[in-house]
């Protein structure tokens, strides 16, 4: 292996180890990237974007572990209920569930939040987003509370009792209602 490749491999290995420990990041170690991070180095550096999170951590009596949650991203903050954002999607790894993608293909607009949760909670999160929309937003021009929410999954089954169905509508409501700008925890 050439010395340059070995040096890069060592640098990347050290970066991964220190980042996992919460220390310096690649940019801080001199690895060049295009652009400059925002003041928070977070998605909320984009004007108007708000994020809400609910994390569920519980050790159950039968030794199962709950390690899951919900993240809600509102691209225009609370205005996301009335003001659409241009949007598109793609399959990063060829599988995984994401609701609302047919409407993104057809209309090219996101009408509301993006919600992320575990694989087996996509359905409850989708339904909760629609319920939240009806309870908190105004009807559209036709008089309907119309929504095809964008809810995506991530597999957390190695860490979480994914078959326990621990994510409930209330968790989704809390993430949506708690969405704010500023630092993302």
Residue ranges and their predicted role:
Residues 21-185:
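Alpha/propeptide regions of enzymes that mature by internal proteolysis
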Residues 7-17:
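Bacterial N-terminal signal peptides
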Residues 1-5:
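Positively charged n-region of N-terminal signal peptides that target proteins for export
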